[in-house]
């Protein structure tokens, strides 16, 4: 048997995927109020929130001063987040997509019940083959980082798997609406921790982000994340897609650990097979 020390901090409470209520198809965003709540630990053996919490705006006013954080391909090049293109990044989709709502899968009415109207507009825009579903290819084409690079394949596949309730490799309008909210929440968190407003997360900013989300992880671990998920350069920094991927996987692994750590001690003992089973069953 092996012992795996975990230290103290881990966000959320026991449950399924981030923010998902029991039996829910869709994991929630970091501030969804579900099983993970705000992404902060509730107290006890896993530590408490950092002073001020991680969700308030950074000092000096609003997060960026620009309405476009660089998620969907809109805006104009310039600063790290650009300016909003006509129609905004989250308002109506570009005229080249669907234009006004047309007869189709959902008729001429508004968004289906329980679907965010803005998410529905973007669903119509992203669904380029008019199939009524969003594939990984379509999702990847629709999502860009602040440096105008496309989201990486790993993050896109992870999000498809999270919100694909039919396990068909694509998401319907309801899954897309949940995904849209999920990305919005992580984007807002990304903006807050990008203290220098560079459009990316540096090593120092990532260390601060993990700490304020409730994780008590060593600088060496943060450096490992930077080495693994940031492009090699003199000053490596993490884009939005990798930030979403890293934080979501940390949440999922935390849940797996918490299920075993019934005494909330920060340490567990388990066999190698139990360890790999626990990890493999939580892979997204």
Swiss-Prot record:
Keyword Repeat in annotation: yes
Chain residue ranges for the region called Disordered: 1-111
PTM summary: Ubiquitinated by the BCR(KLHL12) E3 ubiquitin ligase complex.
Biased composition (Low complexity): 8-26, 65-75
Residue positions binding Ca(2+) 1: 127, 129, 131, 133, 138
SMART domains cross-referenced by the UniProt entry: EFh
Gly residues composition bias: residue spans: 34-50, 76-90
Required for interaction with PDCD6: annotated segments: 204-284
GO aspect biological process, one term: COPII vesicle coating
Keyword terms: Calcium, Cytoplasm, Cytoplasmic vesicle, Endoplasmic reticulum, Isopeptide bond, Membrane, Metal-binding, Repeat, Ubl conjugation
Gene3D superfamilies, per database record: EF-hand
GO MF, any single term: identical protein binding
One Pfam family named in its UniProt record: EF-hand_6
Summary of the function given for this chain in its UniProt record: Calcium-binding protein that acts as an adapter that bridges unrelated proteins or stabilizes weak protein-protein complexes in response to calcium. Together with PDCD6, acts as a calcium-dependent adapter for the BCR(KLHL12) complex, a complex involved in endoplasmic reticulum (ER)-Golgi transport by regulating the size of COPII coats.
Subunit structure: Heterodimer; heterodimerizes (via the EF-hand 5) with PDCD6. Dissociates from PDCD6 in presence of calcium.
PANTHER family: PEFLIN
Protein name: Peflin
């Amino acid at each position: 048997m092996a012992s795996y020390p975990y230290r103290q901090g881990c966000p959320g409470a026991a449950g399924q995927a981030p923010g998902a209520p029991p039996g829910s198809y869709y994991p929630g965003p970091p501030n969804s109020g579900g099983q993970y709540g705000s992404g902060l630990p509730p107290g006890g053996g896993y530590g408490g929130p950092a002073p001020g919490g991680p969700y308030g705006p950074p000092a000096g006013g609003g997060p960026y001063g620009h309405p476009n954080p660089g998620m969907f391909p809109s805006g104009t090049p310039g600063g790290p987040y650009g300016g909003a293109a006509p129609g905004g990044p989250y308002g109506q989709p570009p005229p080249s997509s669907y234009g006004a709502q047309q007869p189709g899968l959902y008729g001429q009415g508004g968004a289906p019940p329980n679907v965010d109207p803005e998410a529905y507009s973007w669903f119509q825009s992203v669904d380029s083959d008019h199939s009524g579903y969003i594939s990984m290819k379509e999702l990847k084409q629709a999502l860009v980082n602040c440096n105008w690079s496309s989201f990486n394949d790993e993050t896109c596949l992870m999000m498809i798997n999270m919100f694909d309730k039919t396990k068909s490799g694509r998401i319907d309008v309801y899954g897309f609406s949940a995904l849209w909210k999920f990305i919005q929440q992580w984007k807002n968190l990304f903006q807050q921790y990008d203290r220098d407003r560079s459009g990316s997360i540096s090593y120092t900013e990532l260390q601060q982000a993990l700490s304020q989300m409730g994780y008590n992880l060593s600088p060496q671990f943060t450096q490992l994340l930077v080495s693994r998920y940031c492009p090699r350069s003199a000053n490596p920094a993490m884009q939005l897609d990798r930030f979403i991927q890293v934080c979501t996987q940390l949440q999922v692994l935390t849940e797996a650990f918490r299920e075993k750590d019934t005494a909330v001690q920060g340490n567990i003992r388990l066999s190698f097979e139990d360890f790999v089973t626990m990890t493999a069953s939580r892979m997204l």
